[in-house]
Structure formats: structure tokens, C-alpha cells
Amino acid sequence: MTDHCASRLLAKLEIPLLLAVPMVMAAALVAGIEQAALAMLVVVALVLALFFAGYEASRPGLRQIMPTLVLAALAAAGRILFGPIPDFKPVSAIAIIAGATLGRRNGFMVGALAALTSNFFFGQGMWTPWQMYAWGLVGYVGGVLAHAGAFDRVDGTVRMPALLAYGFASGLLYGIVINA
């Protein structure tokens, strides 16, 4: 399979992949699986691996990769800098900005990479894939909403109430994923 075919296939699987995590979580809850945490960790790791593979298979150019990496580094540095302040981390805001300006895949990558790199400072653990998934999802949804025009006005400026509402909702989304 060529990179182009793999990229198109994985692009078509993005939504089902992102929905696989809550669906498997609900199924494990209903079925009463005792090792649900391990099963969910495997599913999240698989989703992340496929998302990263899809991004790589899309063969992004340097002009697409560099802003993504710079924003991910900025988000990670901001998380480390504001570490002593509880519940104040700029990762969600930067992931939303990346998704809105660079596209949904780049928004996902910024959120996921920011969690991965900042945890080299805070410590890696079983929570790292969950943080990567949650912040990646925040950036991805920000990109989808921006592409749908949810943040745009007719005159081309940003509709701040909608952007702020999603920023608030993204904090709740992150908390639901992490605490579920």
C-alpha cells in the first residue's frame, strides 16, 4: 500500500478512531470487564499510533511540520512554566489555535505532542496516552469547528463568544476523558 493510499484510508478512519475510545469504554462498562483499564489503555495507544501513522503517511511538508512542532513545544513549555498553578495550563488553548489555523490533524498532533513532551518533565506514566488523546481531541475538535465556520464571522473576524465557549467546553471534555 502506498503512502498516499494509506493516508487516505487513515483520514477516512479518523472519526471512527476517535469514537472508538468512548465506545469501547461504554462497552467495557456494560459488559463488566474486570481489566477495563488495561483494555482502554491498549485502545488509546492503538488510536494514537494510527493517528500518528496517518499524519506521517500524509507526507506533510516542512511548512506544515514546523508550525506544528513550534506550537507543541510552546504548549509543553507553557504547561511546565505554569505547573505550580493548579488548573491553569495553556495546552488546550494552543491546541485549539493549532486546530483552527493549521487544520484538525495538526491540532491533534499539537495536543498529543505537548502532553508527551511535557511529561518528560512531569513524569511519564499510564496517564500519558490518556493526556495525549484528550489534548489531541481538543485540538482536533477545534480544527473541525473552525473548518465548519463555527468561529468565523461574515467580515472575516473571529467570533469570540463561540471560541470562548469551545475553550470552556474543551476543559470539560479534557476532564471527562482524563477522569473517566
Features from the language model and the residues they span:
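Interfacial aromatic-anchored transmembrane helix boundaries in multi-pass membrane proteins
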Residues: 76-92, 112-146
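Broad structural signal for hydrophobic residues in well-ordered alpha-helices, predominantly aliphatic
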Residues: 77, 97-98, 145, 177
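Interfacial segments of multi-pass membrane proteins
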Residues: 99-104, 118-121
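Hydrophobic transmembrane alpha-helices
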Residues: 2-97
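Membrane-embedded alpha-helical hairpins and interfacial helices in multi-pass inner-membrane proteins
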Residues: 3-42, 128-130, 144-180
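Structural signal for the C-terminal ends of transmembrane alpha-helices
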Residues: 48-58, 101-103, 141-150
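Hydrophobic alpha-helical transmembrane segments of multipass integral membrane proteins
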Residues: 70, 74, 78, 98, ...
